[in-house]
UniProtKB/Swiss-Prot annotation:
Protein name: Ferrochelatase
Amino-acid positions noted as binding Fe cation in the UniProt annotation, renumbered to this chain: 196, 277
UniProt entry tagged with the keyword NADP: no
General function of this protein: Catalyzes the ferrous insertion into protoporphyrin IX.
Predominant location category: cytoplasm
Highest taxon of source: Bacteria
Biological source species: Synechococcus elongatus (strain ATCC 33912 / PCC 7942 / FACHB-805)
Family, per entry: Belongs to the ferrochelatase family.
Length: 387
């Protein structure tokens, strides 16, 4: 079999307040996060957005101690996974590849090559697949592989998503049950799943399976839980004026309060590690919205982190992937495109010289408008609460 490695993929997060700006730049410079018709606009726009959002984001990170715990927790998960595999007699090095902050995926691949790894299991720490999370990391890995003959020699097997696995479902159900049982009337607690949202266009135009997998995942968790509690699925972290998957978490919380719900158990279903979206967005922002709306008891299910059932299930998954590889990197980076975003019969987009001239003018006007808003502190983005 040769030397075995496991590459855990995750988002990454700023560990210090001074890291926030560069982290946001890396995030918004990813074309899978912000899709633009002109690649040359990506980096200038990323610089602009990150410059505008850094101060507000730093305030949020101050609320959770001045930095993200994501790297530390992911390292703990990697250590636990390596030990679990070792206990089974499977020697494997476990690496961490973050998409937008250290240790970057590129750093992990360099170490994997230096260690002489022959077989690599690529395992995203996102239970459900989305083109903006696992998909972005897979595409980065494919680009690195395409231009690196040494990387091409490594036998890579990929796990696109794994939300259906029984160990994961059991671990989630166990954590939910523990929070429900803290209530005076556990059977009355409303289970509230909050998933990270994505723009509707990702699902309807790009064919992203994320919404389907999230909805299927919530049903399977409730089936595994085996209780009759009412439950709701909503989507958080919406950014910008475009339509995202609904219902939005803040709206759903207020609606439940209007319906008389008093006991709420919130489940961060997209995340397996504590980070800014659980510790600040859910624990602080959404808690405040819920309590102001009339919800009296707001309990939040902890992220899986190094839950024994979760780590055991990841170990099972690695062993099964080594025994029966199902997907290559190339298999998970070619997503079908369902419709054209800019139909040619309605609008010339980059086909003729005249179209290119108008496209350039429109893009430049938009960029200048953003710069004016940055300098004046007034404009539609401020009105929408984005800046």
């Amino acid at each position: 079999m040769g030397r075995v490695g496991v590459l855990l993929l995750n988002l990454g997060g700023p560990e210090r307040l001074e890291d926030v700006g560069p982290f946001l730049y890396n995030l918004f410079a990813d074309p899978e996060i912000i899709r633009l018709p002109f690649p040359w606009l990506q980096k200038p726009l990323a610089w602009l957005i990150s410059s505008l959002r850094t101060r507000k984001s730093q305030e949020n990170y101050k609320q959770i101690g001045g930095g993200s715990p994501l790297r530390r927790i992911t390292e703990e998960q990697a250590t636990a996974l390596r030990q679990s595999l070792s206990d089974r007699g499977q020697a494997a090095q476990v690496y961490i590849g973050m998409r937008y902050w250290h240790p970057f995926t590129e750093e992990a691949i360099a170490q994997i090559k230096a260690d002489g790894i022959d077989r690599l299991v690529i395992l995203p720490l996102y239970p459900q697949f989305s083109i903006s999370t696992s998909g972005s990391s897979f595409r980065l890995l494919q680009r690195l592989r395409d231009r690196d003959p040494e990387f091409q020699k490594i036998d890579c097997s990929v796990v696109p998503s794994w939300y259906e696995r029984s160990g994961y479902l059991q671990a989630m159900a166990e954590l939910i049950a523990q929070e429900l049982d803290k209530l005076e009337q556990p059977e009355q607690g409303h289970v509230f799943f909050s998933a990270h949202g994505v723009p509707v266009s990702y699902v309807e135009e790009a064919g992203d399976p994320y919404q389907r997998e999230i909805e299927d995942c919530t049903r399977k968790i409730m089936e595994t839980l085996g209780r009759s509690n009412p439950w709701t699925l909503a989507y958080q972290s919406r950014v910008g004026p475009v339509e995202w998957l609904q219902p939005y978490t803040e709206d759903a919380l207020e609606e439940l309060a209007e319906r008389g719900v008093k006991d709420l158990v919130v489940v961060p279903i997209s995340f397996v590690s504590e980070h800014i979206e659980t510790l600040e967005e859910i624990d602080i922002e959404y808690r405040e919205i819920a309590e102001e709306a009339g919800i009296e008891r707001f309990l939040r299910v902890p992220a899986l982190n190094t839950h024994p059932l979760f780590i055991q299930d990841l170990s099972d998954l690695v062993e099964q992937t080594l025994e029966q590889p199902r997907f290559r990197l190339e298999d998970v980076t070619l997503l079908p495109k369902k419709v054209k975003l800019y139909p040619q019969e309605r609008w010339e987009w980059g086909i003729t010289l005249n179209a290119e001239v108008w496209n350039g003018r429109i893009a430049m006007l938009g960029f200048l408008a953003l710069l004016v808003e940055l300098l004046t502190g007034r404009g539609p983005l401020h009105a929408l609460g984005l800046l």
